[in-house]
Amino acid sequence: MFTLIDLPYAPDGLEPVISARTLEFHHGKHLQGYVDNLNKLIAGTEFESMSLEQIVAKSTGAIFNNAGQILNHNLYFTQFRPSALRQAQGPTEARHSEDSDSSCHFDRAQRAEKSALITRLESQWGTLEAFQKEFVAKGVGLFGSGWVWLQADAAGALSIGQYPGADNPVAHGLRPLLTFDVWEHAYYLDYQNRRAAHLEALWGIVDWSVIEERYER
């Protein structure tokens, strides 16, 4: 039986980028719903003893959709950390600045010692800022609901994937590293229809040590 993951930060720990109210609904309602649905769907089936990754790789239909959403959200919520820099700003400055440069949302302190991931990102995109710009553009350009992923293949090569609905890299034999949720429930309470502003702000709370660990596994 699957259970709702605990968040590695306080309910208001990601403010002003993600409000406590959004987190309450996104984690406590939406994700809990997927967990409850999956447990009901797999009861008494071959999937009951499988891991989320195995279910995603082998299932279809409603089971895939709910398992995929749990896997997506688990990786999404655990990739963030409170940012002292962002917390020092007011909600209006953080949420409603349409002209902010996404590069300023990257914690440059985490660049002091280049990891294999950062080296690879710079090798493929030229600069981290260029990667961030393309990643946000892919998220903005994804029609409807879904996820944008930084993913790696077996050789460690990186790519940005656009996945509708509950789909994700695991279902395609790729390794999921970093994701931004572009389902409206992830941002509408805080940003309304300004998806780009939401995605740009997320760089301020990404915990790159988590992403690097996923890449180096």
Pin down the residues of each PLM region:
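Feature for soluble, non-membrane regions of globular proteins
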Residues: 1-84, 111-217
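Intrinsic disorder/low-complexity segments
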Residues: 83-116
